[in-house]
């Protein structure tokens, strides 16, 4: 019978953590900071001690500036190591890895960031949404390093995972970033992205590489993007529509350009309008 109060206390602590996270989501950082102090103290000692809650609240406190700047990296690493021991492969473990990888990237430590991202995988049990968020960041890092072929591969992997997870805004972002790279060089004899992913093998390290894109992949991406982007054609800077027009020209598929031309009165980007006139 003595276990019942402990269970009630744990539930209360869970609710307190949820309240803190809700405040953060609503932008009420100051109130969240106050609650986080109580959650931290209660989770790390006494009858309510809970390693998982402690790791979560320490992760959030590191991200909202409650840890000295010089200690943030160490705190994030502590969270990763603790979660690796008690909840390996969970969404929270993946989230901690994502934040540690981002911390390294923001400091210009790109190889450390890539190494941290490599710990996130479906084989380790991480859910596909976390894996996809990792892959899009890896793609961006490799793109910044001029390593275009693997950047395209990781962006495509992220895109596929986002679509599977019904994460539409993220899928659109990954699709556009992949398309921007893919349009640089096109060859109908190039392998498709699915074949490239199937035959991909680890490399010793990044390099500078590029491979032409298969036009069928480009067409698939445009067909996915087109109805989503056409929900609203307004906006003074529509780089996304520019990519659609470029794909229409390079693949010799005027249907996309003609569809935009039929709705040009809705388009505000002068560069897109000029392209439609050409």
Where is each model-derived feature located?
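C-terminal non-catalytic interaction modules
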Residues: 1-11, 189-278
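Structural signature of alpha-solenoid helical repeat junctions
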Residues: 11, 46-55, 88, 92, ...
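Alpha-helical adaptor scaffolds
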Residues: 98-109, 124-126, 137
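Solenoidal tandem-repeat scaffolds enriched in leucines and small polar residues
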Residues: 129-137, 142-156, 160-183
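Short coil/turn connectors between adjacent alpha-helices in alpha-solenoid helical repeat scaffolds
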Residues: 20-31, 60-74, 101-112, 142-150, ...
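"A position-specific structural signal for the A-helix of alpha-solenoid helical repeats
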Residues: 18, 53-60, 92, 98-99, ...
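N-terminal leader/linker segments that initiate helical-solenoid repeat arrays
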Residues: 1-27
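Amphipathic alpha-helical segments of tetratricopeptide repeats
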Residues: 37-44, 77-85, 118-124, 156-166, ...
């Amino acid at each position: 019978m003595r276990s019942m109060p402990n269970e009630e206390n744990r539930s209360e602590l869970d609710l307190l953590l949820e309240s803190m996270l809700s405040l953060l989501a609503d932008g009420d950082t100051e109130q969240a900071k106050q609650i986080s102090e109580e959650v931290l103290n209660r989770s790390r000692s006494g009858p309510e001690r809970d390693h998982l809650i402690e790791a979560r609240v320490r992760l959030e406190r590191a991200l909202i500036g409650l840890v000295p700047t010089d200690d943030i990296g160490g705190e994030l690493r502590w969270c990763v190591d603790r979660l690796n021991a008690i909840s390996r492969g969970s969404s929270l473990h993946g989230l901690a890895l994502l934040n540690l990888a981002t911390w390294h990237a923001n400091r210009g430590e790109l190889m450390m960031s890539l190494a941290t991202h490599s710990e996130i995988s479906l084989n380790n049990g991480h859910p596909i949404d976390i894996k996809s968020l990792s892959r899009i960041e890896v793609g961006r890092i490799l793109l910044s390093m001029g390593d275009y072929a693997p950047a395209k591969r990781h962006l495509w992997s992220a895109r596929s995972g986002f679509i599977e997870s019904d994460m539409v805004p993220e899928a659109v972002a990954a699709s556009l970033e992949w398309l921007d790279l893919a349009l640089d060089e096109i060859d109908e004899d190039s392998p498709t992205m699915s074949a490239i992913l199937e035959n991909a093998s680890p490399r010793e390290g990044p390099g500078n590489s590029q491979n032409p894109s298969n036009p069928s992949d480009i067409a698939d991406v445009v067909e996915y993007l087109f109805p989503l982007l056409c929900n609203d054609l307004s906006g003074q800077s529509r780089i996304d529509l520019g990519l659609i027009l470029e794909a229409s020209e390079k693949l010799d598929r005027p249907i996309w350009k003609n569809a935009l031309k039929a709705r040009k009165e809705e388009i505000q980007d002068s560069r897109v309008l000029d392209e439609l006139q050409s």
